[in-house]
C-alpha cells in the first residue's frame, strides 16, 4: 500500500487518524462531507484552475496517470498540470511543473492568503513540498526550485481580474531543503504504519490537544475518553502542561477535576457548573451589561460569502460579500418584536442594496445587538472602505453595537450545557430549548454562504432557487430571533434574582 501526500500530512497531525483514514474510511467519513467542506474543495479547484492561467499552455494529466506523466517528463514537456509520480512506497500529484531549460520548477497552489495563521501554514506547506520533492527525486526527475503560489492578501480588484497581481509566487526552496532528511524518515514511518493490519493501541497524540485541535476520529480511537472531557475546558489547548497533567493523572471527565488543581477562573466556573449541574450567574456584571442596552433594541445578524476569487470592484481574496441581514427590533420593555429582513439574489454587487436596506430597517437610535461584534463591525468597516460616501452611517452603526456574546465569553453566565463554548448554536438550546436550528434546511453559516452562491451563479433551477431563498430567510431570521430570546432569558435571570439548577 502506497503512502499518498494527503495521508502523510494527516499522519503528521495524528498517526492513528492516518491509519483509520486508510483502513476504516467508513469511520473517517462517518458523516458525509458537509456543505462547508465541499465548498472548500470547490474553492481549491477553482483557484488551481485559475492559477494555471499564470502558466499557460500546459498539458493537463489525467487523474492517476503516472505512466503518461513519466513519458511527458522524459520528453521535457514545458508545462504540466497535475502530473502524477509514484515509487514503490509513495505517490503524489503536483499542481504545476515548469521546465526551466535545465530542471523542472515545482509550483504548489494554495487557496489561501496566509493571514494570521501564516507561520503555521507555511510549515505545513513546506512539508507538503518536501514530500513532493522526495517523490520526484525518487523518479529521477531533475528538480529545480520549489515555489508556493497563493492568493495575494493585498490585491484589490478594480473590476477586472489581474492574474499577475491576484497570485503571489514565493520561493520555498530554502525552507524545504533543510527538512528533507527528517521528512524522508517521517515518510518511512508513516508508510510502515499504514501497512499495519490493526489500529495501534490508544491514546493518539491528540489526547494532549484541546478539543478543537483533535483529529476527526478521536472518539473512535480513544473510546475511554468521555464525550465531555477536560479537553473541552475553555482555552485548555493554550495550556498544554495543564492538560498533560490532567490526562497523565487519569483525570478525563470535567467533573473529576480536583478542587485543588490549578485552573483559571473561567475554567473553574465551567467545572463547577458541570459538577453541580447548576447555572452560574455573575449577577453584578450581567446587570450592568443589560442596563447599558438602550431601546429601541435591534438584534442584527449578517450573512456573507467569502469569495476566494474577487467578483466585484473593491474586493480582495476571501473578502466577505454581505448579501443578507435579519433584524428583530423591540421598541420598549415588554414590546412585541418587529422583524425586518433583506436578501439580495442578483448577480451584481450587493453592497449598495445592502446598505440602503440597512438604512431603512435600522432604528435611528438605540442599541444594535449582535453576536461576535468583530464580524459585523468588520463587514461595516469594509463596506465603508468600498463606499466612502456611506462611511458616516456605517461608523454610526458600529458605534452603537453591543456584543451579546460578551455575556458568555466573559462568563457572566455559565451553563453546564455550554461545555465551554460561546457559539449561539450552543447557548440557544441551553437557555431557550424551545428554539432550535435542527428543523431548518440550513443550520449553519457555511451552508448559508454556499446556498447563496449557488443561487446567484445559476447553479440551481428556478424553483430550487426560490426555495433556497426561503431557506436563507428562515435561517438568518432564527439567528436574530435567537439573540432576542437569549436576551429575554438573561433579563429573566436578573429579575428572578436566584441561581437555578440546570435542566
Regions found by a protein language model. Give the residues of each.
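Metal-dependent nuclease catalytic cores that hydrolyze phosphodiester bonds in DNA/RNA
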Residues: 1-103, 243-269, 274-276
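Conserved RNase H-like, two-metal-ion catalytic cores of nucleic-acid enzymes
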Residues: 51, 85, 106, 285-364, ...
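Conserved DEDDh/DEDDy metal-dependent 3′-5′ exonuclease domain
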Residues: 70, 77-83, 87, 91-95, ...
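Short beta-strand-loop-alpha-helix junction that forms the active-site gateway
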Residues: 109-120
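Acidic, Mg2+-coordinating catalytic module of metal-dependent nucleases/exonucleases
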Residues: 154, 159-230, 249, 427-502
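Long, highly charged low-complexity segments
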Residues: 251-309
Amino acid at each position: 500500500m502506497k503512502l499518498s501526500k494527503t495521508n502523510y500530512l494527516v499522519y503528521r497531525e495524528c498517526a492513528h487518524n492516518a491509519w483509520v483514514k486508510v483502513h476504516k474510511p467508513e469511520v473517517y467519513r462517518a458523516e458525509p462531507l458537509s456543505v462547508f467542506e465541499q465548498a472548500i474543495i470547490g474553492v481549491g479547484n477553482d483557484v488551481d484552475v485559475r492559477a494555471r492561467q499564470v502558466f499557460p499552455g500546459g498539458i493537463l494529466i489525467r487523474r492517476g496517470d503516472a505512466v503518461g506523466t513519466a513519458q511527458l517528463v522524459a520528453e521535457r514537456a514545458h508545462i504540466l498540470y497535475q502530473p502524477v509520480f509514484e515509487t514503490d512506497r509513495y505517490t503524489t500529484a503536483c499542481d504545476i511543473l515548469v521546465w526551466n531549460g535545465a530542471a523542472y520548477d515545482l509550483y504548489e497552489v494554495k487557496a489561501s492568503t496566509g493571514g494570521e495563521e501564516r507561520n503555521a501554514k507555511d510549515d505545513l506547506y513546506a512539508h507538503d513540498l518536501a514530500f513532493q520533492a522526495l517523490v520526484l527525486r525518487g523518479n529521477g526527475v531533475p528538480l529545480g526550485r520549489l515555489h508556493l503560489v497563493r492568493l495575494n492578501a493585498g490585491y484589490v480588484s478594480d473590476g477586472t481580474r489581474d492574474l499577475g497581481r491576484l497570485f503571489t509566487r514565493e520561493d520555498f526552496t530554502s525552507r524545504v531543503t533543510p527538512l528533507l532528511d527528517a521528512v524522508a524518515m517521517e515518510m518511512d514511518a508513516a508508510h510502515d504504519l499504514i501497512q499495519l493490519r490493526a489500529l495501534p493501541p490508544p491514546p493518539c497524540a491528540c489526547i494532549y490537544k484541546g478539543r478543537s485541535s483533535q483529529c476527526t476520529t478521536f472518539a473512535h480511537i480513544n473510546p475511554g475518553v468521555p464525550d465531555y472531557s477536560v479537553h473541552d475546558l475553555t482555552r485548555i489547548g493554550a495550556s498544554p502542561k495543564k492538560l498533560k497533567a490532567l490526562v497523565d493523572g487519569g483525570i478525563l471527565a470535567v467533573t473529576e477535576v480536583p478542587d485543588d488543581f490549578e485552573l483559571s477562573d473561567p475554567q473553574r466556573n465551567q467545572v463547577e457548573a458541570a459538577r453541580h449541574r447548576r447555572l452560574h450567574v455573575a449577577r453584578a456584571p450581567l446587570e450592568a451589561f443589560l442596563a447599558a442596552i438602550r431601546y429601541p433594541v435591534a438584534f442584527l445578524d449578517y450573512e456573507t460569502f467569502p469569495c476566494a476569487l474577487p467578483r466585484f470592484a473593491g474586493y480582495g481574496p476571501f473578502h466577505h460579500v454581505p448579501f443578507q441581514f435579519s433584524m428583530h427590533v423591540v421598541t420598549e420593555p415588554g414590546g412585541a418584536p418587529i422583524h425586518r429582513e433583506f436578501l439580495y439574489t442578483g448577480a451584481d454587487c450587493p453592497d449598495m442594496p445592502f446598505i440602503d436596506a440597512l438604512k431603512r430597517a435600522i432604528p435611528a437610535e438605540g442599541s444594535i445587538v449582535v453576536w461576535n461584534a468583530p464580524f459585523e463591525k468588520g463587514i461595516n468597516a469594509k463596506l465603508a472602505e468600498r463606499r466612502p460616501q456611506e462611511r458616516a452611517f456605517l461608523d454610526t452603526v458600529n458605534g452603537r453595537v453591543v456584543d451579546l456574546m460578551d455575556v458568555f465569553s466573559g462568563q457572566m453566565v455559565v451553563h453546564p450545557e455550554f461545555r465551554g463554548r460561546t457559539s449561539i448554536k450552543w447557548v440557544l438550546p441551553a437557555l431557550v430549548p424551545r428554539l432550535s436550528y435542527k428543523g431548518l434546511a440550513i443550520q449553519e453559516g457555511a451552508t448559508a454562504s454556499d446556498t447563496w452562491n449557488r443561487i446567484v451563479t445559476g447553479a440551481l433551477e428556478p424553483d430550487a432557487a426560490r426555495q433556497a431563498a426561503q431557506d436563507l430567510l428562515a435561517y438568518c431570521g432564527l439567528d436574530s430571533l435567537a439573540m432576542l430570546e437569549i436576551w429575554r432569558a438573561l433579563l429573566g435571570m436578573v429579575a428572578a434574582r436566584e441561581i437555578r439548577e440546570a435542566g
